[in-house]
Amino acid sequence: PPMDKVVYIIFNQNKSGFIPLHADESDKTDQKDFFTQNDDFKCWIQHAGNEESLYLAILPLWESEAPERKRIVDKIISKYRPLCQTE
């Protein structure tokens, strides 16, 4: 989907709540297959079962620069250890 400058987290849900799978940041994009082209997409599906079981959280940061967004993503990764995170 089209997005402006954001930090995003992909989740799946189980009985105990939402499980973070992947966190990242993005500049503005109009790429419709932005998420499905992610290198970790197969891992997301393995954990969620199907695309419909994936959830997306977005933190809009319209006036931000990439280093600021990266700092936020690094904090998220450090605290929540998303299951499909690759660096």
Listing of model-derived features with the role each one plays in the protein:
Residues 31-50, 55:
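A broadly used, surface-exposed interaction patch
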Residues 82-87:
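Coupling/hinge elements of helicase-like and P-loop NTPase modules
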Residues 1-34, 60-78:
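GIY-YIG nuclease catalytic motif and its immediate N-terminal context
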